[in-house]
From Swiss-Prot:
Protein name: Nuclear receptor subfamily 2 group E member 1
Classification via Pfam families: Hormone_recep, zf-C4
Subcellular location: Nucleus
Subunit structure and binding partners: Monomer. Interacts with ATN1; the interaction represses the transcription.
């Protein structure tokens, strides 16, 4: 599949001026990798002031191996190689990179003319006709093309900016380990939510259902899709980091609530670890996403029990997704006869962390009290995605 215009994939074999890693093109006036350009952008936009860890300002090594060890020296190196601070500020105008601002703009109806199309490569092995399109929707990473620089045209799409990453082969499938600092966990969560919606919206079988059924399925499955995304993209789920992100501690949070949050974070860590032990490939993740999405079980909206308009079609789609996964595993992993069963047995664990905890930990700081289900509905209906 050919790469779309404007793809941010690395196409140049030119070293990053800051750390020496392979650059992905010119960023803020110099050739730089995604890691250093993203670090520079966040530092300038948020007006960060760093203190050298060794006390020797500018003396720490800044290379591919050590670039994350001292932010002060890394920023100094960015400035020394003439990265342009003004280019950051004028990119979209000064802003706080939060979902709250983007949601406000989004609800006012602004649309992105250029769009932000993800690069969706095809999978290595063929799949049945029903599922070929689904497996092709698995991206190489949470990587979207740049969006317009016009402030009034920002949408939720602009949250999905490239994050520093390193390729890692898992069963031949490129995965990405994030350089996620506390400040960027919420942005990574936003990208996961965005990509889950974009994925569902792009599944041909999903779009054949009524809009009401599509929204009900998405509202019920978003938590499982989110946790699957954490496992797939190797996003860190360190308890201390997540608590720091949420802002919760013993001084400002009821002990019973805090203990519940900590317990569910531990449950999240356990389920993510179990998925990573099995080293799933992109096709398996795509199949599991369909299995957890196509659930023809009546859902509750407050005290109201809602039923699907076409429950039979939804159940049939889930059956087909399971059959596809089973067939794929038998072909791809003939020496692992129990693999299919192991994957299915993992699915209930995706619901071991409550939606309220995910909202509290990953989204509360950025969207406040806006319900995720409302956000999902409006994002899904948007032509921007």
């Amino acid at each position: 599949m050919s790469k779309p215009a404007g793809s941010t994939s690395r196409i140049l074999d030119i070293p990053c001026k800051v750390c020496g890693d392979r650059s992905s093109g010119k960023h803020y006036g110099v050739y730089a990798c995604d890691g250093c350009s993203g670090f520079f952008k966040r530092s300038i936009r948020r007006n960060r002031t760093y203190v050298c860890k060794s006390g020797n300002q500018g003396g720490c090594p800044v290379d591919k191996t050590h670039r994350n060890q001292c932010r002060a020296c890394r920023l100094k190196k960015c400035l020394e190689v003439n990265m342009n601070k003004d280019a950051v500020q004028h990119e979209r105008g000064p802003r706080t990179s939060t979902i709250r601002k983007q949601v406000a703009l989004y609800f006012r109806g602004h649309k992105e003319d250029n769009g932000a199309a993800a690069h969706f490569p095809s999978t290595a092995l063929p799949a049945p006709a029903f599922f070929t399109a689904v497996t092709q929707l698995e991206p190489h990473g949470l990587e979207l093309a740049a969006v317009s620089a016009t402030p009034e045209r920002q949408t939720l799409v602009s949250l999905a900016q490239p994050t520093p990453k390193y390729p890692h082969e898992v069963n031949g499938t490129p995965m990405y380990l994030y350089e996620v600092a506390t400040e960027s966990v919420c942005e990574s969560a936003a990208r996961l939510l965005f990509m889950s919606i974009k994925w569902a919206k792009s599944v041909p079988a999903f779009s054949t259902l009524s809009l009401q059924d599509q929204l009900m399925l998405l509202e019920d499955a978003w938590r499982e899709l989110f946790v699957l995304g954490i496992a797939q993209w190797a996003i860190p789920v360190d308890a201390n980091t997540l608590l720091a992100v949420s802002g919760m501690n013993t001084d400002n949070t009821d002990s019973q609530k805090l203990n519940k949050i900590i317990s569910e974070i531990q449950a999240l860590q356990e389920v993510v670890a179990r998925f990573r032990q099995l080293r799933l490939d992109a096709t398996e993740f795509a199949c599991l996403k369909c299995i957890v999405t196509f659930k023809a079980v009546p859902t509750h909206s407050g005290s109201e029990l809602r039923s699907f308009r076409n429950a039979a079609a939804i159940a049939a789609l889930q059956d087909e997704a399971q059959l596809t996964l089973n067939s794929y595993i038998h072909t791809r992993y003939p020496t692992q006869p129990c693999r299919f069963g192991k994957l299915l047995l993992l699915l209930p664990a995706l619901r071991s962390i409550s939606p309220s905890t995910i909202e509290e930990v990953f989204f509360k700081k950025t969207i406040g009290n806006v319900p995720i289900t409302r956000l999902l509905s409006d994002m899904y209906k948007s032509s921007d995605i």
